[in-house]
Regions:
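Phosphate-binding chemistry for phosphorylated carbohydrates and sugar-nucleotides
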Residues: 1-192
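Catalytic-core signal marking the mid-to-C-terminal active-site face
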Residues: 177-293
């Protein structure tokens, strides 16, 4: 995929490519679209005076993508919601939106207001196939996961960084806004969301079924209506999802997801809050629920 974007876009003069040479060791860095790997893109765009700017990094096999617009990094939690809003409001496409249970609920809030159904799935892009297939009764306008994978309407069943890039460019061309400007407009209307991902190790004896059982037990003490202390605040459980681990959604639309690793003695925790000061308390509260049972 190194030279595919240039070919797709007919080699425009405004396109600058980085790291497109053959290198089986990837320059000694982890081959992924991470914040750290955006540094060279940031440098190029920060020096640009152009009105419209878009930077993107792919992983080597071209299935994941992350953006930078000259002002901020935009990950898939944000871009997926942004792309869905564009497809539903500017292009006026009909269908649903698909996302994994570990992905930001930013898109849920947008979809609810627009009257569009959300298909929330276990982690893993293969789970989006029922809404990406050509004969789907209800097609996903976009399907995305927090680990920077996206696909969508009339595209491949697999995550596709090039689809993400083309949608981003279309958004800019049609709306006349950089991605960050579009995102700010959504924040103004729907509020901000602060997702995080972390985890911790447990005793090796818990690997496999015992660890899954311990995580599943959280559902028995965090049912809808239950109270959970998050820092100094008491939150009320609004909804409980057990598609993949246990996801607890609170009345203020913040949430926590506790998932067991299937192969390692690790527990993965995903949280999202509406106030950045709650990031650490949310993680500690999720961890406390795991050790409570």
């Amino acid at each position: 995929t190194r030279r595919r974007p240039a070919a797709l876009l007919d080699n425009p003069e405004c396109l600058i490519t980085l790291r497109n040479e053959d290198d089986s060791l990837f320059g000694g860095i982890a081959p992924e679209p991470s914040s750290k790997n955006l540094e060279k893109v940031r440098k190029v765009l920060d020096e640009s005076k152009s009105e419209f700017r878009l930077g993107a990094i792919f992983d080597p096999d071209g299935d994941r993508i992350r953006f930078y617009d000259g002002t901020r990094e935009i990950d898939m939690n944000q871009f997926g919601a942004l792309a869905f809003h564009y497809m539903a409001t500017w292009r006026k496409e009909q269908g649903c939106v698909a996302k994994s249970v570990a992905t930001s609920n930013f898109v849920n809030i947008i979809a609810e207001k627009l009257g569009v159904p959300v298909m929330e799935t276990p982690v893993g892009f293969k789970n989006f196939r029922p809404w990406l297939s050509r004969n789907a009764k209800q097609k996903a306008l976009v399907a995305f996961e927090e680990s920077d994978g996206i696909s969508g309407l009339n595209n491949t069943l697999e995550k596709d960084a090039q689809f993400g890039l083309l949608i981003a460019l279309e958004i800019m061309a049609v709306t006349g806004k950089n991605l960050g400007e579009y995102l700010d407009a959504l924040y103004e209307e729907y509020g901000r969301f602060y997702p995080t991902r972390s985890g911790f190790e447990v005793d090796k004896s818990l690997v496999g079924a015992p660890l899954k059982a311990k995580v599943d037990a959280i559902a028995t003490i965090a049912k809808p209506g239950a109270k959970v202390m998050v820092g100094k605040n008491e939150k009320t459980v609004k909804q409980l999802l057990t598609l993949d681990g246990v996801k607890i959604i609170f009345e203020d639309d913040s949430w926590m997801l506790v998932r067991p690793s299937g192969t390692e003695p690790k527990v993965r925790i995903y949280t999202e809050c509406r106030n950045p000061d709650e990031k650490d308390p949310m993680f500690e509260a999720a961890k406390a629920l795991f050790f409570k049972n």
